Amino acid sequence: MALLGHSCSAPAAPPAPPVVRRLSDSTVQVAAGPQYKRSGLHNFFWGRHYRTLWALPVTVPVVNLRTAVPGGLIPVREGGSFQTKNLRLTDRNGVEYVLRSVDKDATKALPEGLQNGPIGRLMKDQTSVINPYGAYIVPRLAQAAGVYHTNPRLVYVADDPDLGEFRQSFANALYLLEERPEGDQRTVASFGNSSRVESSRKVFTNLLASTQFRVEARQYLRARLFDMWLGDWSRREDQWRWASFEARGGGIRYRPIPRDRDHAFFKFNDGLFTHVIGWVKSNYQTFDEHIRLSDVEGLNRAARPMDKSLLVYLSREDFRQVADSLHQQLSPTVVREALSVWPKEVYGLVGAEFERKLNGRREQLPAVADKFYSLLAHDVEMPGTDQPERFVVDVPAPQQVRVSVYQRHATRPDSLVGARTFRADETVTLKLFGLGGNDVFELRALPAPGISLGLYDGAGQDMVLGPAQPTTATRTTVFDSGDGTILTLPAAVKVKRYRPAADEFDAAGWLLRHRLY
């Protein structure tokens, strides 16, 4: 038992400075994390993960801040997430770059008193679940997939005086150097040459403020299926930036820029304890040759609020078409070329393994997309905005419901925002949220009991208008906030008076509810 307890505590000592072998003035050979190499007993309980890869010395270029880009780079600010150390830099034109540490430290999320204890040491040890060179191969794959991407370069930062005040914290380590996807990016093709790249907080605020702002849903779906192919389960809203473009008919259209690929190619379930934890925390899915079709929900849990909102108008056929397109574009040749950018030591150790796994997962993309659609279609929430909308509900066929959402205009015909037909064999509950603005819910027909339909009026002076013909068999409910909503409904429609929670009332509440703020 003492031996088991010793193994479980993961008593990793603080890492010593890495052994650096100078090959030339511009090249070194160094391991990303030799401290993750552990005993066989420890690996049995806590997993082999990518420990061998972390301990492997690789040949890497030394970055010179004065020559890294034309005119050089100037460090301006230290930052980072709860596990990655970042250094923000700018070039002579004010374009921002970032150095992101290859090694991670998740203990920063713990209270200070726990960081150096057994829990902290175990968390630090489990950095070995990350492929230290995974993000480095993503750009070539993303380019082939038609997905926007950053362009990380694997570099070694020596004891460079140009680091200035950040020299002590950032010298003598491996980093990924990449553009920072923010602001004016007209010179970066992989960001769509967008003149304005925005944060998720800004974009979701705009999406619920007005129908003039929209995300290109098929492009977002393409990026999400690409995430699943990479096994990247950590796709919460802060992992995205958004390239904005002016639409032909007016308004703004957003295309996604995924960033931070730390959890792509995750390897977790190869230890006794981590295998058990993986079944409890089903989002911790290992990058294997086959995607776990039985738990596509777990793989996508972090992004579920975004997925439910941004993919709400897409059909199963849309999902199939995008998956088939990705299957065609991510060919074995593309995979082989992408892997070839790895340092030769890395490619020699795991190149064949990754080629096999990526090609195997590619064959599953259509099935994964179909499962993904089914999960999202089961319970649907369709929000409006804080401007006036008209929700039109019709029944095109038995056991079907069609919802069309229009932006209301005072002096011209209403304009279609989006429409989708729901089927009772796919969708159990369908909820429409007016949010702010003076909205109209127009029930031209009532759905059969196969689909439960809920209408939430929200803020503003709203109207809910039912069909003239009597209907008895329906599960349609209007949730009336009691703020003066006009109701003209047949008796078959239930009306429930309720005090709406803030998260059902307007755009700000919706963002809070789904943690998209």
Regions found by a protein language model. Give the residues of each.
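Juxta-kinase regulatory segment immediately upstream of eukaryotic protein kinase catalytic domains
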Residues: 31-67
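C-terminal catalytic region of ATP-dependent kinase domains
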Residues: 127-128, 244-420, 424-431, 437-454, ...
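Bacterial signal peptide processing site
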Residues: 7-11
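ATP-dependent phospho-/nucleotidyl transfer catalytic cores
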Residues: 157-232, 245-255, 267-270, 333-341, ...
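A conserved hydrophobic secondary-structure block that centers on an alpha-helix together
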Residues: 129-139, 144-151, 209-238, 243
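Bacterial N-terminal signal peptides
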Residues: 1-6
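Conserved ATP-binding subdomain of kinase catalytic cores across diverse folds
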Residues: 62-198, 252-253, 257-297, 421-422
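Extracytoplasmic
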Residues: 82-84, 237, 427
